[in-house]
Amino acid sequence: MFNGIIVIDKAAGMTSGDVVYKLRRLLKQKKIGHAGTLDPEVTGVLPIALGQATKLIELMHERPKAYVGEGMLGLATDSYDLEGKILAERALSQPVSDQAIKAAMEKLIGEIVQQPPIYSAVRVNGKRLYEYAREGIPVERPKRTVQVFRYDLTAPSQFDPEKGRQTFTYEVECSKGTYVRSLVNDLGEELGLPAVMTKLRRTASSGYKLQDAVTLEELADNLDHAEDYIQPIDSFFADYQQVDLDAALWQQVKNGAWIKLPLDADKVALRYNKTVKAIYRAKGQGLYCPDLMLLSNE
């Protein structure tokens, strides 16, 4: 069984569940899970936990995510992307200045309250929002507080005078639960114009980037060397403060004992035999208690 994290560069047209299903067949392994759903039309970084690494999935969700994408002013849909029903169209007689676009983006940086698109996987009373939408049932969408760390215009926007549409490219870095589609829609509202997301690619998630990723096709063509594409579990904890345990302290840790450490970090990665075995969290006065045991007791 493989233990570690494989970063897939997801193609358009696939769900995150599709990727997990294909990996289970390719690797002949059931214990696999993804960390962070990507909509079918969105491409890019999809971290997949294998074997013992599935214990990390909740921690993986907590890390910031980064995206590059394109949006368009002059059109709005109910899904906030090109897959949905058109709700509003307005031909622009002249382009919006890039300065105005940047100023609107800056207003959306920080802690903001978002409402997910009606076509999304958020559950309300046990049912996903897109199911209500497909059945034509009105439902109140729950609001959520998210963090947007960066929202930048990455190139001069492009205005099409014949269509009265203006396209722009952007980069976003945000917390879990942030809908980039909603950010594009919110940008339009700040500008007083309909807006829609036209393209999105995730470039980073759970601490992994596109340069760490492999496509399913490339993996399938090189199955004899599948381990070459798998990141070790320890790679996820590269930015944690790490403590190497001696045999006596390891005996305590593997039995779940609290330990005393001369540290002030909130969480520490405890290593034994050059491998992270557990994550401990601070309880005050130098005491640390178990937060996550990564491997079975040895």
From Swiss-Prot:
**Designated gene of the protein:** truB
Q: Which Gene3D superfamilies does the UniProt record give?
A: Pseudouridine synthase
The UniProt keyword set, sorted, is:
Isomerase, tRNA processing
Which PANTHER family would you find in this protein's record? PSEUDOURIDYLATE SYNTHASE TRUB1, TRNA-PSEUDOURIDINE SYNTHASE
Q: Which family does it belong to?
A: Belongs to the pseudouridine synthase TruB family. Type 1 subfamily.
Instruction: Output the Pfam families linked to this UniProt entry.
Output: TruB_C_2, TruB_N
Q: Which HAMAP family match?
A: TruB_bact (MF_01080)
Q: Which GO terms describe its biological process?
A: mRNA pseudouridine synthesis; tRNA pseudouridine synthesis
Which residues are named in the active-site annotation? 39
Q: What does the record give as the reaction this protein catalyses? A: uridine(55) in tRNA = pseudouridine(55) in tRNA
What protein name applies here?
Answer: tRNA pseudouridine synthase B
* UniProt EC number: 5.4.99.25
Q: What does this protein do?
A: Responsible for synthesis of pseudouridine from uracil-55 in the psi GC loop of transfer RNAs.
Any one Gene Ontology MF annotation carried by this entry is: tRNA pseudouridine(55) synthase activity
